[in-house]
């Protein structure tokens, strides 16, 4: 998979049997630091593309990690499909496809970092796939409650026939019928369904909440941690943060630092974040962010020409 002579971010395409494709970006560990034991897979939050996590990938690679990101099918980003057809099950299948692809390429030690809505997907699959550890940030545990807060109305109480055509979720039109139908059919919507999915979790797990998060109740995340009944789990709070971890540079840097510390700790089988990290220069983080936006635009233009 790796190509040391490749561009700063290595672009991969997973081609599916139905003609669709999932775009994957690979970031190699920096050459001047010891390479860590695990590959980090980042699952972006809803309405976030993989290039939105350029800074986190830079932090992780600066500290010796091999980093993989992807855009889900039927989501914002470079993979196939439109966001008005997105469902939680499509997000789940996209994640599973990328994990299988990594396994096929000889990557066996995977640590998963999942944010926001993708964390709910991670909780669903964590006991069904081979992971070494899990890190979630502002992870959704009660989907129905989070949707009600984000949309300012509990649309899941309505009959399918009475739903509006689209739900405006963070400026994107989410197809209401297909999304809500999938939620009920596959039991994505309740806290209890999340608790059932993580029951008996054996791998190390660190969860980050944000103390100003109005979309996810910290009490419910604590309930999730307690339900696992394992000493291999730990909860931390990102002080001063809301659900939007990129709302300002101070919050964003704290997120990068905290998650990188968690990854380093878990790479060594620890849960304590009293650990030193190598901080990339601000100019390097800015540069890689700009370069990846350009790469995204170039790929989008190529896709338009092929359409």
UniProtKB/Swiss-Prot annotation:
Coiled-coil regions, chain positions: none
Keywords: Acyltransferase, Luminescence, Transferase
Molecular function via GO: acyltransferase activity, transferring groups other than amino-acyl groups
Signal sequence bounds: none
Top-level taxon in the UniProt lineage: Bacteria
EC number: 2.3.1.-
Keyword Transferase in record: yes
Record: active site: 116 (charge relay system), 213 (charge relay system), 243 (charge relay system)
EC class: transferase
Family from the record: Belongs to the LuxD family.
Function: Acyl transferase is part of the fatty acid reductase system required for aldehyde biosynthesis; it produces fatty acids for the luminescent reaction.
Protein name: Acyl transferase
Organism encoding this protein: Aliivibrio fischeri
């Amino acid at each position: 998979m790796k190509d040391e002579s490749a561009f700063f971010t290595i672009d991969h395409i997973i081609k599916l049997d139905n003609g669709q494709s999932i775009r994957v970006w690979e970031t190699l560990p920096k050459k001047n630091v010891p390479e860590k034991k695990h590959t980090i897979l980042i699952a972006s939050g809803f309405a976030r593309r993989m290039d939105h996590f350029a800074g986190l990938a830079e932090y992780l690679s600066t500290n010796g990690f091999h980093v993989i990101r992807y855009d889900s099918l039927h989501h914002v980003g470079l993979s196939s499909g439109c966001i008005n057809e997105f469902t939680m099950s499509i997000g789940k299948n996209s994640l599973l496809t990328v994990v299988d692809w990594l396994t096929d390429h000889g990557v066996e030690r995977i640590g998963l970092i999942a944010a926001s809505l993708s964390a709910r997907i991670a909780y669903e699959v964590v006991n069904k796939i081979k992971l070494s550890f899990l890190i979630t940030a502002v992870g959704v545990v009660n989907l129905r409650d989070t949707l009600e807060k984000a949309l300012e109305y509990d649309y899941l109480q309505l009959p399918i026939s009475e739903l509006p055509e689209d739900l405006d979720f963070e400026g994107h039109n989410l197809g209401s019928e297909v999304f809500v139908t999938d939620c009920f059919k596959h039991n994505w919507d309740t806290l209890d369904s999340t608790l059932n999915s993580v029951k008996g979790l054996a791998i190390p797990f660190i969860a980050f909440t944000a103390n100003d998060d109005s979309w996810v109740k910290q009490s419910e995340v604590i309930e999730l941690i307690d339900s696992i009944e394992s000493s291999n789990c730990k909860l931390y709070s990102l002080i001063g943060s809301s659900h939007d971890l990129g709302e300002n540079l101070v919050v964003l840097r704290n997120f990068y630092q905290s998650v990188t510390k968690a990854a380093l700790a878990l790479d060594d089988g620890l849960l304590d974040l009293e650990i030193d990290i190598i901080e990339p220069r601000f100019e390097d983080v800015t540069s890689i962010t700009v370069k990846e936006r350009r790469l995204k635009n170039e790929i989008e233009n190529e896709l338009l020409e092929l359409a």
